[in-house]
Amino acid sequence: MKKQKRNLLAALALLAALMPVHAQKMSGNPLFPGWYADPEGAVFGNRYWIYPTYSDAYEKQVFMDAFSSRDLIKWKKHDHILDTAAVKWAHKALWAPAIVHKDGRYFLFFAANDIQNDEETGGIGVAVADRPQGPYKDYLGKPLLDKFQNGAQPIDQFVFHDADGQYYMIYGGWRHCNIVRLKADFTGFEPYADGSVFREITPEGYVEGPFMFIRNGKYYFMWSEGGWGGPNYRVAYAIADSPFGPFERIGVVLQQDPAVATGAGHHSLINAPHSDDWYIVYHRRPLTETHHNHRATCMDKLEFDDQGLILPVKITFEGVERNKPLRH
């Protein structure tokens, strides 16, 4: 009898331990604790990854963390995958990571120092590692781009891999956006056929935070509008037949909900492998917070209508459903 009781208690304890795991069917928003912004989403191997900006005073933004998950529910933190100790020319404002896996290595593009003119040191850099969780080290020993071009501040870089294999860097703050052709080894830029290097593709309303993807042969260009420190930060988009546009603004797809959060913006998308399931990863400010740096990383479903237009995203507290664990 005692043995049966012990077995029963053990079974009940095991069931109790497992129940919370099975009961959690939604990710919840925010995805993980802490103030993090400008999230870059990616899929590497059997894990989803998020690379955000650590949201604090510029002088304290001297490192980057990453987060990984197999099912979009449970997220593991990877501390200090990059910090300014590994990038001698960077000393503050490490922002807006963009990640690329190429030739067996992981390239992390980042902005640093928030330069205000061409005389200051900083701009867009590249770090490299053998694993998605790093540690990352400076790839070039200097910025990849440290000058203003077409009025665009060298920040908020996104690396776009086109269908023909070409890699582009789309970037820019101060209401201007450029697209440049990256060299195959990411050490610099290649000129276009006309000899130019920087092509401006700024759409109406653009402020910062560009993102591009292809779906059904169309190029979707997304960006953030408004001030990042205020409640009206938002995401708009356009569609074109080329990565060079022209991009005519269609409308807003992500914005605040007075019942949920404010300042929803600076996003990226994750397309679940082998599916047409899309998730928007973004930051927002909880209703309880007013400090501009109190931004949290969240995820919600992104969907399209029959014409391929993006449906307005409903920001939620629930987040997204558990995804089938990824396998290699």
Can you annotate each of these PLM segments?
Residues 1-25:
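Bacterial Sec-dependent N-terminal signal peptides
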Residues 23-328:
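Carbohydrate-active catalytic/glycan-binding domains of CAZyme proteins
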